[in-house]
A protein has these predicted regions:
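Generic detector of well-ordered alpha-helical segments enriched in charged/polar residues
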Residues: 6, 57-60, 120-127, 140, ...
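Long, mid-chain structured domain cores
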Residues: 60-133
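Alpha-helix boundary/N-cap detector
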Residues: 3, 50-54, 113-117, 121, ...
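Amphipathic, membrane-inserting segments
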Residues: 65-70, 78-80, 87-96, 162-231
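N-terminal start-of-chain detector that recognizes signal peptides
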Residues: 46-49, 153-158, 169-174
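Membrane-inserting effector segments that mediate pore formation, membrane fusion
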Residues: 111-162
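An N-terminally focused, membrane-permeabilizing/fusogenic/translocator signature enriched
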Residues: 1-86
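Generic secondary-structure transition motif, activating predominantly at the C-termini of alpha-helices
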Residues: 13-17, 64-67, 130, 134, ...
């Protein structure tokens, strides 16, 4: 019993030594001293929630509207990537922060590059996720007429492939895959021009088809430039 009382007294003394205190800074801010090593501001400045948008037009409309009385503030618009834009307020030097006001993220389809798709899925992907232009139609035409049956081989020299395609109503013919092809998928904001880039078009023995990106990501820089030019 005596040892328990002694332990309780020791704990009480320890708590007294770490008594919570309110500390006032030179700027008048009050901080809570929880453990002598970490100060927590009692009434920190509250920032408005980040406004989330999906189009560049909505961002431009917001900035022009002056709904939040921002016309006289020095804002910074940052094109983070081909799918994201951020707007920051001027620096809050007192709190050491640059508050973010707006976040804009493009709503674009997820295109399964480098993944094998059957002919139907591949054709749907081309028609729904790519801009209608010459090379898209060339690939679409080839994919639509592709025919691989038992005993048929896809000839491949590492650059192009030869496959059997329907030629007319009943006859079949050998045709070379179009490669490389220049396509414009929907990958950035709809308000700006979709960058064109090169792709490798491939077929496997099961007649599945795939597109592989072949421009090293150069299109991303072009997309960022297009967004900045629009703004």
């Amino acid at each position: 019993m005596t040892e328990n009382i002694k332990d309780a007294l020791s704990y009480a003394v320890e708590l007294a030594g770490k008594e919570n205190k309110i500390i006032c800074s030179k700027t008048g801010k009050e901080y809570f001293d929880g453990n002598e090593y970490s100060l927590q501001e009692l009434n920190p400045r509250k920032y408005t929630p980040i406004l989330e948008l999906q189009t560049i037009k909505s961002l431009v409309d917001y900035l022009k509207s002056d709904n939040d009385l921002i016309s006289n503030r020095k804002l910074i618009v940052v094109v983070n990537s081909f799918q994201e834009i951020s707007v920051y307020d001027q620096v809050d030097f007192e709190n050491g922060k640059r508050p973010q006001l707006v976040s804009v993220r493009a709503s674009v389809p997820v295109i399964p590059f480098s993944n094998w798709r059957d002919q139907e899925e591949f054709n749907i992907m081309l028609q729904s996720m790519f801009i209608d232009d010459a090379d898209r139609n060339l690939v679409l035409d080839f994919a639509s007429h592709l025919k691989i049956e038992k005993g048929t081989e896809v000839q491949d020299n590492g650059i192009s492939q030869m496959a059997t395609v329907r030629d007319g109503v009943a006859s079949l013919a050998q045709a070379k895959t179009p490669n490389p092809v220049t396509l414009r998928p929907y990958r950035t904001f709809n308000e700006v021009e979709q960058p064109a880039s090169q792709f490798i078009f491939r077929i496997n023995k099961s007649a599945s088809l795939a597109l592989f990106e072949a421009d090293g990501g150069k299109w991303k820089l072009e997309a960022v430039e297009n967004i900045a030019r629009y703004l």
